[in-house]
Amino acid sequence: MSSFENLRIVDNFYQTSLFFPMPTVIISTLCEDGSTTLGPYSLIQPYYVAGKDYYAMLLSCRNSSNTAQNILRNGKCAINFIDDNPKTFKEAVKLSWPGDKPSDKMPKCKFKLEDGITQEETGELRPKVLTDAIEVIECTWVRELDGADKDKFYIF
């Protein structure tokens, strides 16, 4: 007899029932009005780590999410790695509801934000980064990477 228990697969099964040793990150992106919005993710991993003129990360997210739509629209995001403090996770969960508008969730957000190094160095408008992040990767969407220039974004 197996020592494992058979679990019923439910919505968000990977968050509620499975263990993947993945970091939890907060992705910061720019809204249409230039303000920063945040979304928590754990489905992120290195994509290209060597042998290229650049490095790449792979983010799995719904194409209709605010995060995906903002990245497709302006090609910028920051990957903010957060600590594993329960208070930090509680704050991350508040940002995770699909359909929440940035204008509704961001005023209640307790994460402190600051300009990232790229914006300071270039003056280019970029998503703000979490002040208390363990580390931050500031990213630019390479639209042509592996045919990504064929991706579409939708305005709902």
What is the predicted role of each segment?
Residues 1-37, 45-156:
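Active-site-proximal mixed secondary-structure blocks
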